[in-house]
Amino acid sequence: MLTFARQQQRKNIRWLFCLSALMLLTLVLSLCAGEQWILPADWFSPQGELFVWQIRLPRTLAVLLVGAALALSGAVMQALFENPLAEPGLLGVSNGAGVGLIAAVFLGQGQLPGWALGLCAIAGALIITLILLRFARRHLSTSRLLLAGVALGIICSAMMTWAIYFSTSFDLRQLMYWMMGGFGGVNWQQAWLMVALIPVLLWICCQSQAMNMLALGETSARQLGLPLWFWRNVLVVATGWMVGVSVALAGAIGFIGLVIPHILRLCGLTDHRMLLPGCALAGAIALLLADVVARVALVAAELPIGVVTATLGAPVFIWLLLKSRA
């Protein structure tokens, strides 16, 4: 038994090492990719200093952090709601952040500073997450909780559409494209949002013991002495913060939080000591690759990254849904 445990631990460490190496490679690829490819040898040329360090580097860092945040949010929500299909985009949390952001733009007449818009997006994500947690406490079945989340997402989406349709503000109409997901407008001025993600990401990755207990179910976690009320509320705040900041940076990006934790579990990373850092690395890799595709797929144009992740993630979600019903 001890030998098997050691073998599994070594296998998990190898997985994390491979994911770390792959993330570094995709980071380099992201800095090179664009309408004009710039190889590492040219990064310190006058042209490279402008395109790589001033334009592509802040975008790449934002993609990396948002991918890690969304994947971790999915893993946390799946343990928190005891629901393998829980995911920020699917359960309406991302749309809730969008409603908060659009409400801030609408009520503030476009005069609010960037930090206030970010806080409103975080507040919107927190409100939807708290509503979902309220539903979860009523011991709804997996399918009913999923439907409740989808319904909340539809309501939030309808609110955003109505606000944008009747608005004469260019800022609100511009948000319609932005809510499809994209990092085109990210620069060093949004560095404070990136910094705001880092401590929460690191803190979540260190909470493997509590996450393992939550994954066992409410009854087992309580018997093991876990203060459920405290951890539920803390994790709700952490998840809402990560999703809200991610939406403020890049708009609504779906399926990363659903697909990444499932793929890693299928690869054997079931212990949250390995699953959480693995989700952060794999989420960063997946979104970096999607961002590269979004940049280079069309000539002189850029695809919304939400379209790329939805196109790749929707078939995987259907497969997971059919598998969970089997």
From Swiss-Prot:
GO cellular component, one term: plasma membrane
Domain of life: Bacteria
A biological process from GO: cobalamin transport
Ranges in coiled-coil conformation: none
Keywords: Cell inner membrane, Cell membrane, Membrane, Transmembrane, Transmembrane helix, Transport
Transmembrane segments: 15-35, 61-81, 88-108, 112-132, 146-166, 184-204, 240-260, 274-294, 302-322
UniProt subcellular location: Cell inner membrane
Pfam families reported for this sequence: FecCD (PF01032)
Membrane-related topology note: Multi-pass membrane protein
Example GO molecular function: vitamin transmembrane transporter activity
Similarity annotation: Belongs to the binding-protein-dependent transport system permease family. FecCD subfamily.
Functional description taken from the UniProt entry: Part of the ABC transporter complex BtuCDF involved in vitamin B12 import. Involved in the translocation of the substrate across the membrane.
Assembly behavior: The complex is composed of two ATP-binding proteins (BtuD), two transmembrane proteins (BtuC) and a solute-binding protein (BtuF).
NCBIfam families: PRK03784.1 (NF003001)
Protein name, per record: Vitamin B12 import system permease protein BtuC
